[in-house]
A protein has these predicted regions:
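C-terminal and inter-domain tail/linker signature
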Residues: 27-311
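Bacterial N-terminal signal peptides
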Residues: 11-20
Length: 311
């Protein structure tokens, strides 16, 4: 009689436990959906793309029917960008991916000859958007000029600091990574005092193969150089595609436009990557066309990211 009287209660308890586990499992599945193309998948798509560039062959690139391609700001067919057909070697390579957004970004150098005496060298940047393992967007920028007399051939080995995974204690959220990049752009735009940006004491910045801070030609630090009021561009169309929490990497493409008071400041569209460690800007690397020939980007602004619950 005692066992018989407790049996319904036991079954009820078991049902409640199982229902609770199922609810938590369903909630976890909703909170962290698996991306349809993870880091490995995105990197493989980029590898196919860069090999296609060097082979001048687009046949293995899985392009969506809605694919849009731009080269230096102009719409072009796939495989018809400035360096396609000329690029034979890609000595400098730096890849970045974000499975959350399906973004792939790359900064490198290409040359048209298999030796160091190539007739032409380019700084080369590309952004891909991947949806359902197909490429839906390609944004290429290439530049065969020099900044302060430094050729793209000067770049040989990418800085692996961007690949280093940070200890959890030194990581910040996606939202903070994005906010930190925007603070930097606000400083450049002159809307935020540079003292208010989170600088790391080791901060350095590389632009088109040139260290532009802490050097004889540009003695200012990442922060202190903004004491010079001429260092100003209005940064528009800030498209932050990558926010890698584990590595502390955030990357964007933006329009740097000349301010009215300094109309001779070179306007361009820049690929720019930041290493954020302990919430501080430790390293910055940018590539862009260093002359006035770059067209203003016609890629649309990105909507703000909606942070996941608990972020």
């Amino acid at each position: 009689m005692i066992c018989r009287s407790y049996r319904p209660i036991a079954w009820l308890g078991l049902c409640l436990v199982l229902c609770g586990l199922g609810a938590r499992g369903a909630e976890a599945a909703r909170a962290a959906p698996e991306p349809d193309c993870n880091r490995r998948c995105l990197l493989q798509i980029l590898q196919i793309y860069t090999e296609g560039l060097l082979d001048n062959n687009t046949s293995r690139i899985k392009a969506a029917a809605t694919l849009r391609v731009t080269s230096n700001g102009s719409d072009v067919p796939l495989g018809k960008g400035e360096v396609w057909g000329s690029a034979k070697r890609m000595p400098y390579r730096q890849a970045f991916v974000d499975p959350v957004t399906g973004a792939v970004m790359f900064m490198g150098t290409v040359t048209n000859a298999p030796t160091n005496q190539g007739e032409r060298w380019w700084f080369y940047m590309v952004r891909l958007k991947v949806v359902a393992k197909q490429v839906t967007e390609v944004e290429e920028i290439s530049y065969d000029g020099m900044l302060r007399g430094n050729s793209p051939s000067k770049l040989t080995q990418a800085d692996r600091i961007y690949d280093a995974v940070l200890p959890v204690s030194e990581q910040v959220s996606r939202a903070e990574l994005i906010a930190t990049a925007n603070k930097y752009f606000d400083v450049v735009s002159g809307t935020l005092d540079y003292h208010e940006a989170p600088w790391h004491p080791e901060c350095s910045r590389l632009e088109d193969a040139v260290l532009t801070v802490n050097q004889p030609e540009s003695a200012g630090s990442c922060a202190g150089e903004f004491e010079n009021p001429r260092l100003k561009w209005i940064v528009k169309n800030r498209r932050i595609y990558i926010a890698d929490v584990e590595r502390g990497v955030v990357m964007a493409v933006s329009n740097f436009t000349s301010p009215p008071e300094y109309p001779n400041n070179n306007a361009s569209v820049a690929f720019e990557v930041f290493k954020i460690q302990d919430g501080l800007i430790r390293h910055i690397e940018a590539m862009f066309r260093g002359d006035s020939s770059m067209k203003v980007s016609t890629w649309p602004d990105l909507p703000p990211e909606t942070p996941p619950k608990g972020d």
